[in-house]
Amino acid sequence: MNIKDIGVIIAKKPLKENTFIITVFTKNHGLYSGVVKEFSKKSKFIYQEGNIIDFLWQARLHEHIGMAKCELIKSYTGYFITNKAKLYAFNSVISLIKELFHEREEHSKFFSFLINYLDNLSKNFCFRDYINFELALLAETGYKLDLTKCGVSHVTTDLIYVSPKSARALSYEVGKPYKDKLLMLPRFLLSDNSEITLEEKRQALALTNYFFNRYLFHNNRQVEARQTFIEYTLNNF
């Protein structure tokens, strides 16, 4: 059985000498793992996490791990390795994909979203883009937040809370009596022009973290790369 697709390498682990298992997030087939062999400097460069590749997967049966062959399309290593904010953001997003997506489950629209994010990240780290990535990931896994209007009154102004139950924004008037039980909605998620304060960064990360923990991080398990990103971001404002 053969699978041919374009993909992003999101994980690589050693199997034996010069042999590795890579996990690739493919455009049309979701996550696929395959065995690759490294016998040259060129092949080592090809099989780096974050590389966009032409991916060929071969196995006798669909349920096997299979062998993989890759041709490099684009490498992001040089853009990320010298900038901690970019590197930690990159490590976080690929670790979240590996953690939350199931093997061989198609996410073709999200694949395009990821490629666009990596292109933007290679140019400049933007915290707003990172949070929008996490929100898009929540939506892709079935837990979309509606931050466009109040979930009760339907007004589109004075939105400052998010209901942890409905995942919808709430206006100041509606949410005020219950504010101690609500999540805060950072202003920068409602306007592309607003500057982002440290407190708003905390609010944004608390917002996505709540829904990750409630629905996706089983047994309160955290993604280490995401924790590293959060610590760096909040301590280097």
Curated annotation (Swiss-Prot):
Keywords on record: DNA damage, DNA recombination, DNA repair
Keyword DNA repair on entry: yes
A Gene Ontology cellular-component term: bacterial nucleoid
A biological process from GO: double-strand break repair
Entry annotated with the keyword DNA damage: yes
NCBIfam families in the cross-refs: reco
Family affiliation: Belongs to the RecO family.
Function (record text): Involved in DNA repair and RecF pathway recombination.
Protein name, as recorded: DNA repair protein RecO
Source organism (scientific name): Rickettsia conorii (strain ATCC VR-613 / Malish 7)
Lineage, highest ranks first: Bacteria, Pseudomonadati, Pseudomonadota, Alphaproteobacteria, Rickettsiales
